[in-house]
């Protein structure tokens, strides 16, 4: 059973700091002069400026705040919608927008407001607008270590709690587990829906990414897919009409597009969405393919983008493509082949070239994007040699740079045709 405590153990200094020294600050009598002195001192230190930055000490006391207040904080600290490989900062959103994007119930938010205005007054957080804009920003202004320390303090209090609202506690622990996982890097994160926005494409592309594991790298969208998708969207009309020499109209045969090793399907779905904008859905058939364990999620992404009428997610094993051929035919029939980041083992260059040779039509074009990882420099050279030996010609190359979840990466694009 997963225990988030295994991920992080704050040192004694951090835990003490995150308790806000409440044992010293909290008066025994709520009406005593000691409390008045505390609030007066806090008031003098706080600014009336709505832009005043808050810090971890402004988070509700784990010791004294009710679970509804802690739950609301955890929901507000949920990451914003991920666009490409970045997060929206959450600045200047309305209360309604924050509630909608975070799935936050208004009554829960009002409970947090009561905490900051009546139970533990804080001028920096004494309105719904301040709460909704400042609390989410703590993910960017407070260190991960301090946030993890706060989360751990919450876990210690509520993991074995009893006598409290069981439904609230279960929801709190669920949100808490997600916040801890999100704070520990991409490989520890739960499943997410990431949105991709491309120039010259009128709609964003939602893609579901399950939790990433070492043996299922296809569950993640890699940077090379974004680079190739942008190229496709920017130049689809040129790439298609110049190299395949046909247009999508009622007088032309059906055009067939194949994405190999599609993963989450970004490249194939980008092609499909741009094609739909330009020409509609007539005379086009698109296959996004991968291994069996990847295709289930791939089907979900086709559905998320409402492309099921002309895009099929299917199994295509590069070591045994006969099942795909027996089911659909199409050997040497694809006008366009799309491949992004296919080289991450010594066997892949041969498999990739075999698939291009087997499925590319005589007048077709393959668009290949590969990251220039030092670890696979030898495999890239083998790929280049095998392309020449297989009567395939690189007619265009271009270098580019981009980013993914692990930082900046350099990429190489190749446009490939038959000799």
From Swiss-Prot:
GO biological process: methylation; positive regulation of translational termination
InterPro entries linked: Methyltransf_16, SAM-dependent_MTases_sf
Lineage of producing organism: Eukaryota, Fungi, Dikarya, Ascomycota, Saccharomycotina
Keywords of the record: Cytoplasm, Methyltransferase, S-adenosyl-L-methionine, Transferase
Coiled-coil ranges from the UniProt annotation: none
Record's protein name: Protein-lysine N-methyltransferase EFM2
UniProt: S-adenosyl-L-methionine binding residues: 222, 261-263, 290, 318, 340
Subcellular location: Cytoplasm
Transferase keyword on record: yes
EC top class named in words: transferase
Location (main, coarse): cytoplasm
EC identifiers of the protein: 2.1.1.-
Family: Belongs to the class I-like SAM-binding methyltransferase superfamily. METTL21 family.
Signal peptide: none
Disrupted gene: phenotype observed: Increases sensitivity to antibiotics that target translation and decreases translational fidelity.
Gene Ontology terms: cellular component: cytoplasm
A molecular function (GO) term: S-adenosylmethionine-dependent methyltransferase activity
Top-level taxon of the source organism: Eukaryota
């Amino acid at each position: 059973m997963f225990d988030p405590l295994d991920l992080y153990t704050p040192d004694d200094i951090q835990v003490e700091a995150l308790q806000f020294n409440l044992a010293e600050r909290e008066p025994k009598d709520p009406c005593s002069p000691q409390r008045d002195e505390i609030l007066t001192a806090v008031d003098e230190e706080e600014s009336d400026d709505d832009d005043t930055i808050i810090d971890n000490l402004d988070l509700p006391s784990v010791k004294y705040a009710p679970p509804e207040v802690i739950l609301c904080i955890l929901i507000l600290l949920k990451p914003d919608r991920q666009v490409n490989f970045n997060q929206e900062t959450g600045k200047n959103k309305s209360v309604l927008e924050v509630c909608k994007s975070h799935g936050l119930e208004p009554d829960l938010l009002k409970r947090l407001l009561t905490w900051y205005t009546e139970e533990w007054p804080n001028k920096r957080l004494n309105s719904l607008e301040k709460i909704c804009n400042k609390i989410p920003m703590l993910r960017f202004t407070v260190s991960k270590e301090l946030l993890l320390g706060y989360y751990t303090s919450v876990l210690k209090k509520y993991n074995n709690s009893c006598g409290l609202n069981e439904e609230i506690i279960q929801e709190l622990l669920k949100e808490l587990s997600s916040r801890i996982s999100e704070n520990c890097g991409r490989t520890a994160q739960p499943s997410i829906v990431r949105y991709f926005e491309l120039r010259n494409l009128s709609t964003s592309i939602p893609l579901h990414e399950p939790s990433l594991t070492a043996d299922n790298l296809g569950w993640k969208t890699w940077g090379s897919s974004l680079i190739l998708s942008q190229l496709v969207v920017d130049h689809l009309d040129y790439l298609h009409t110049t190299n395949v020499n046909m247009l999508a109209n009622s007088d032309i045969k059906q055009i067939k597009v194949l994405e190999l090793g599609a993963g989450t399907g970004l490249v194939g779905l980008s092609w499909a969405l741009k094609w739909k904008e330009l020409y509609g859905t007539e005379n086009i058939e698109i296959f996004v393919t991968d291994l069996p364990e990847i295709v289930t999620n791939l089907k979900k992404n086709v559905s998320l983008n409402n492309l099921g009428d002309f895009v099929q997610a299917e199994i295509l094993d590069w070591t045994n493509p006969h099942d795909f051929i027996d089911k659909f035919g199409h050997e040497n029939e694809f006008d366009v082949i799309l491949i992004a980041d296919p080289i991450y083992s010594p066997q892949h260059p041969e498999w990739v070239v075999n698939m291009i040779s087997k499925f590319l039509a005589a007048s077709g074009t393959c668009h290949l994007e590969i990251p220039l990882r030092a670890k696979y420099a030898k495999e890239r050279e083998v790929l280049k040699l095998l392309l020449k030996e297989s009567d395939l010609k690189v007619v265009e190359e271009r270098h580019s740079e981009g980013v993914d979840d692990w930082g900046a990466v350099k990429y190489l694009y190749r446009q490939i045709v038959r000799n």
